[in-house]
Design a protein with these regions (language model features):
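Conserved ATP-binding subdomain of kinase catalytic cores across diverse folds
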Residues: 3-106, 132, 136
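Active-site flanking residues adjacent to catalytic metal/cofactor-binding acidic residues
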Residues: 38, 142, 160
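Short, glycine/acidic-enriched loop or turn micro-motifs at the edges of active sites
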Residues: 104, 146, 164
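AlphaC helix of the protein kinase catalytic domain
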Residues: 108-117
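Conserved alphaE helix
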Residues: 119-130
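Residue immediately N-terminal to the catalytic "proton-acceptor" Asp
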Residues: 137, 142-144
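Hydrophobic residue at the +6 position relative to the catalytic HRD Asp in the kinase catalytic loop
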Residues: 144-151
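C-lobe/activation-segment region of protein kinase-like
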Residues: 152, 157-211
Length: 211
């Protein structure tokens, strides 16, 4: 436990890749836990210049919410990191951490698409199937983009960063449109291969018989 707490206070490794966003993590190997990743919750936007890593506690802390969402999505067959633990400290403003199993030698889909587009397009088939499972269960991943998709060394495809995910009461077609729109914006903004967007749109519409 002491070793894990020390990781909470260790300098985090900022995401250096395209679409890495504000995510900062610490990777380590701890006896009894194995290879893990500690996610340090940090703010984005202008507010980060004033309050970078503290949140006002209103309801569940972010780390607990994401932990529970990961349990849920994995339970319906979505490939997401295995949650191990969560922690937060302070009130009414708190810092938060989430501990998950490490995905070995990961590469984001955004990175892959820039160095091996054919492989990235092949991976998109698995991404579409994962998103389809989310839609089937009315789960909307608000911030899903190619930087939040990891490919492990064994070829496994994982969706990350569910801290802003939510159950959506709308019908599946409306949720589908939200996913397509969010994904397209990210691909366009960061000048990733356009086929990433086209394959997401075509794959989801085909799965739901939408023209």
């Amino acid at each position: 436990m002491d070793a894990l707490i020390r990781l909470f206070n260790a300098p985090a490794e900022p995401a250096a890749s395209v679409l890495g966003g504000r995510i900062a993590v610490t990777s380590s190997h701890l006896q009894g836990l194995g290879f893990i990743v500690v996610k340090h919750y940090s703010r984005g936007g202008l507010i980060k210049y004033f309050i970078k890593r503290r949140y006002f506690k209103w309801g569940k802390p972010r780390c607990q919410f994401e932990y529970e969402v990961l349990v849920k999505v994995r339970g319906v067959g979505v490939n997401a990191p295995e949650p191990v633990a969560y922690a937060y400290y302070g009130r009414p403003f708190y810092k938060a951490w989430l501990v998950t199993r490490e995905i070995q030698e990961p590469q984001t889909l955004a990175e892959l698409s820039r160095v091996d587009e054919p492989h990235a397009l092949n991976v998109m088939k698995a991404v579409v199937e994962q998103v389809t499972r989310l839609i089937d269960n009315h789960i909307f991943h608000v911030d899903l983009h190619p930087g939040n998709v990891l490919i492990g060394k064994d070829g496994g495809v994982f969706l990350l960063d569910f801290d802003k995910a939510r159950l959506h009461g709308a019908d599946r077609e409306k949720i589908l449109d939200k996913y397509i729109s969010r994904w397209h914006r990210a691909v366009t903004k960061h000048r990733l291969p356009g086929m990433l967007s086209e394959m997401m749109r075509a794959g989801l519409k085909r799965n739901y018989d939408v023209i």
